[in-house]
Amino acid sequence: MAGQRLAAGFLQVPAVTRAYTAACVLTTAAVQLELLSPFQLYFNPHLVFRKFQVWRLITTFLFFGPLGFGFFFNMLFVFRYCRMLEEGSFRGRKADFVFMFLFGGVLMTLLGFLGSLFFLGQALMAMLVYVWSRRSPHVRVNFFGLLNFQAPFLPWALMGFSLLLGNSVVTDLLGILVGHIYYFLEDVFPNQPGGKRLLLTPSVLKLLLDDPQEDPDYLPLPEEQPEL
């Protein structure tokens, strides 16, 4: 029964969040069971374009390291903030949400190559957190019961926490940079005098992914509900 409830609850999670989280968990499980090796997953331009190992363009965003505290920490934030974006500012706009992933993924891959970064899942997580935080500026965040601050400070708190764990902050900075570029092009520049939307979601994505109507049973997370 508990397993059935867990499965039913997971199926209630929005599609993009559900698919990305499941892919990350399954990839890590496959590495843990030695069905795959991290050396088969990391981004390597030579192997992608000369050996046609094109899956590396995707798997670089799916592997968050071996099973442990770092993995569960990252999955918690990926699941939470990906879901809040999908149920919040991207509600009813699944194609736009997927296009944000594609835009961010391409830009991170190019910049990550210049910086010799081989796994970019943490950068994608930082981008999701950054975009959510800029679109929810008045939400107060409780950071593990230790700190309480406005949402725009969250990406920097995560970067500081990563530094305390002894990790490099370059990947976090890459995600924040790409998140800011997306936020500027999508939310800031179009509202400037003479500005316009530059990131236009391809029609084929809208045709394939957007729902014809909203789910009448939709219930947003508490953070996304308007205050009375």
From Swiss-Prot:
GO terms for cellular component: endoplasmic reticulum membrane. InterPro entries: DER1, Rhomboid-like_sf. GO terms for molecular function: signal recognition particle binding. Keywords: Endoplasmic reticulum, Membrane, Transmembrane, Transmembrane helix. The chain crosses the membrane at residues 23-43, 58-78, 99-119, 169-189. Its main location: endoplasmic reticulum. GO terms for biological process: endoplasmic reticulum unfolded protein response; ERAD pathway; negative regulation of retrograde protein transport, ER to cytosol; protein N-linked glycosylation via asparagine. It is a multi-pass membrane protein. Residues 1-22, 79-98, 190-228 are cytoplasmic. Pfam families: DER1. Residues 44-57, 120-168 are lumenal. Highly expressed in spleen, lung, liver, spleen and testis. Expressed at intermediate level in kidney. Weakly or not expressed in brain, heart and skeletal muscle. It is found in: Endoplasmic reticulum membrane. Forms homo- and heterooligomers with DERL2 and, to a lesser extent, with DERL1. Interacts with VCP and EDEM1. Interacts with SELENOK and SELENOS. Interacts with the signal recognition particle/SRP and the SRP receptor; in the process of endoplasmic reticulum stress-induced pre-emptive quality control. Belongs to the derlin family. Functional component of endoplasmic reticulum-associated degradation (ERAD) for misfolded lumenal glycoproteins, but not that of misfolded nonglycoproteins. May act by forming a channel that allows the retrotranslocation of misfolded glycoproteins into the cytosol where they are ubiquitinated and degraded by the proteasome. May mediate the interaction between VCP and the misfolded glycoproteins. PANTHER family: DER1-LIKE PROTEIN, DERLIN. This is Derlin-3.
